[in-house]
């Protein structure tokens, strides 16, 4: 039983790790590249030269640079969030692999660690799509919109556009997150190979019989 259960969880963690790593490292790369690129654009366009005319010199239009500055800060927060709260399914299989399993006691200890890692993976996936994550992202994007409109004295429509753009990126991040560990944990708790302690009750076996004798008959159902 221990071997079968351990094989199930090990296979599940290893199978889910490649896509989890792609999602986690991919979004770190996207957020990092966005933060750096927008930061450079904000710095280079902040003091753009104004065309000199005989009329009074107009105020430089910094709306593009301001948008890039706000976007850079938002993306930097995205990188920080992914680093502070790592995506456990991306590394769980690697953490389990070095543990020995040569004796029954070692296999039992490894199984306990495997179950713990699988539950951590499922919990992290649920948190990543949970209400708290949605509210935190909405708060950051709302703050970015307020800064655009209030701090930079821009129209509120510009603030709404900033909020909507940031929220679209946040939702793409949330709903592209893998959820395999959550499904694997449900399968394991519902009755994986050798997991007799968590298996679902077997359907009761029904038997029927029909008896005939002179003057009558009988029907018997056993369950």
Residue ranges and their predicted role:
Residues 28-37, 70-75, 135-143:
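Mid-membrane cores of alpha-helical transmembrane segments in multi-pass membrane proteins
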Residues 42-47, 65-89:
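Glycine- and aromatic-enriched membrane insertion/assembly motifs of diderm outer-membrane
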Residues 59-73, 155-165:
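Hydrophobic alpha-helical transmembrane segments
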Residues 16-69:
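N-terminal Sec/ER secretory leader and immediately downstream segment
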